[in-house]
A protein has these predicted regions:
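Conserved acidic catalytic loop of the alpha/beta-hydrolase fold
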Residues: 74-89
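Conserved alpha/beta-hydrolase catalytic His-Asp/Glu region
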Residues: 147-203, 208
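Gly/Ala-rich beta-loop-alpha elbow adjacent to hydrolase catalytic centers
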Residues: 93, 97, 101
């Protein structure tokens, strides 16, 4: 394992590179309630399957830093690829990381071999949440807009919604997973935290899915918020080469809940692709 800091305009990205550098590269992009440690249990089966696995903390997350500047998450991803000498990569993105993956594939199509969206967001996509989900989202928004916000209270509701799944018992997911996500999530809302200002892709990806030139696998959990599966189905219908898989009995953090099963889905999807580097 090699850890490095990649400089980007106004910040530095904490990057971890594992596996044989001569093997095809797979880049893992974490969710907005997490950092690169969310992928700890997914990396070993991917490395064992013969892939070079790169993951990094996005700006404002984990050990990455940023000034209070405008920036592009797509350009940051390309900066990581360039720093590691990677021409093209498979992108595996969870939630916000999936949105970054789709945006990057539209803006930089020659750098992306394929995408695996894991509970992935799509910029500009508006689903149809249930009334219960709307109430939860309203509660989350109120906590985030409080002055000052309570990081622990925000992390608690994020765990209820995204880790347990809406309406699911706290005992459904092992306590170690819940605690790990809580510890990754809360620092984003701490006093003095600087996250920068990500500049969205324009027009957003939801209106440009037909422009995706790479194959896409969209994996959604059956216990996740309803618009995640809706986004996966929308992607399957609109992108030229996309397939949706709904995995029952898991929620949003699929890579933490069932890493071996997710790794198997990823490998099955990317193994037939022509070798890349």
């Amino acid at each position: 394992m090699t850890a490095t800091a990649v400089p980007v305009p106004g910040g530095r990205l904490h990057v971890v590179d594992e596996g044989d550098p001569n093997h095809p590269p797979v880049v893992l992009l974490h969710a907005g309630i997490a950092n690169l440690r969310a992928w700890d249990v997914l990396v070993p089966p991917l490395v064992d399957a013969g892939y070079r696995v790169v993951r990094y903390d996005a700006r404002g997350f984990g050990a990455s830093t940023t000034d209070d500047v405008d920036f592009s998450n797509r350009a940051d991803l390309i900066a990581v690829l360039d720093a590691l000498g990677i021409g093209r990569a498979v992108l595996v993105g969870n939630s916000r990381g999936g949105q970054i993956a789709f945006d990057a594939a539209i803006e930089f199509p020659d750098r992306v071999v394929a995408i695996v969206g894991v509970g992935a967001g799509i910029g500009g996509f508006e689903g149809e949440p249930t009334p219960e989900e709307v109430a939860l989202f309203d509660e989350m928004e109120a906590l985030e807009e409080a002055d000052p916000p309570d990081p622990d209270a925000i992390a608690d509701i994020d765990v209820r919604v995204w880790v347990d799944g809406p309406g699911q018992p706290e005992t459904r997911v092992p306590a170690a997973i819940r605690d790990k996500v809580r510890k990754m999530d809360a620092p984003q809302y701490a006093p003095g935290h600087v996250g920068g200002r990500p500049v969205p892709l324009a027009p957003p990806a939801a209106a440009r899915l037909a422009d995706l030139r790479c194959p896409v696998l969209a994996v959604a959990g059956g216990l996740d918020v309803s618009d995640v599966a809706q986004a996966a189905r929308h992607l399957e219908a609109q992108a030229p080469d996309a397939r949706a898989v709904i995995v029952p009995d898991v929620a949003h953090m699929i890579g933490m809940e069932i890493p071996d099963q997710l790794a198997a889905l990823i490998v099955e999807f990317i193994a037939p692709l022509p070798r890349w580097s």
